[in-house]
UniProtKB/Swiss-Prot annotation:
The lineage of its organism: Bacteria, Pseudomonadati, Pseudomonadota, Gammaproteobacteria, Vibrionales. HAMAP family: Ribosomal_bL25. Keywords: Ribonucleoprotein, Ribosomal protein, RNA-binding, rRNA-binding. It comes from the Bacteria. Pfam families: Ribosomal_L25p (PF01386). GO terms for molecular function: 5S rRNA binding; structural constituent of ribosome. This is one of the proteins that binds to the 5S RNA in the ribosome where it forms part of the central protuberance. This is Large ribosomal subunit protein bL25. Part of the 50S ribosomal subunit; part of the 5S rRNA/L5/L18/L25 subcomplex. Contacts the 5S rRNA. Binds to the 5S rRNA independently of L5 and L18. NCBIfam families: PRK05943.1. Disulfide bonds: none annotated. GO terms for biological process: translation. GO terms for cellular component: cytosolic large ribosomal subunit.
C-alpha cells in the first residue's frame, strides 16, 4: 500500500482543526535515526484501507517525493464519529 503524505509546516491545535475540516488529518512519522516528521494524510484514502489486515503491516508513505516504509503505531479516533483524529507511524 502506498499513500501520499504532505509535510506540515503549521503545527498545533488550530492547524490540526483546519486540516480535519479540509478532509485530511495530522500524523507523525518517527523512529530510526531520522528526526520525527509531522505530516498530513488524506482521511478518506486511509479510512478506506484501515479495514484490511495489510494496512497494519508495512506500508509506504511518499513524503516529499521520498518513499518511507512505515508501520502504524497508534490511531486516535473520534469518540462517536467514524473519523481518524491522528495517527503515529514508526519507520521500519
Amino acid at each position: 500500500m502506498k499513500f501520499e503524505a504532505v509535510v506540515r509546516t503549521e503545527l498545533g491545535k488550530g492547524a490540526s482543526r483546519r486540516l480535519r475540516l479540509a478532509g485530511q488529518f495530522p500524523a507523525v512519522v518517527y523512529g530510526g535515526e531520522a528526526a520525527p516528521v509531522a505530516v498530513a494524510l488524506n482521511h478518506d484514502d486511509i479510512v478506506n484501507q484501515m479495514d484490511k489486515p495489510e494496512f497494519y503491516e508495512a506500508i509506504t508513505l511518499v513524503i516529499g517525493g521520498e518513499e518511507v516504509k512505515v508501520k502504524p503505531q497508534d490511531v486516535q479516533r473520534h469518540a462517536f464519529k467514524p473519523k481518524v483524529e491522528h495517527m503515529d507511524f514508526i519507520r521500519i
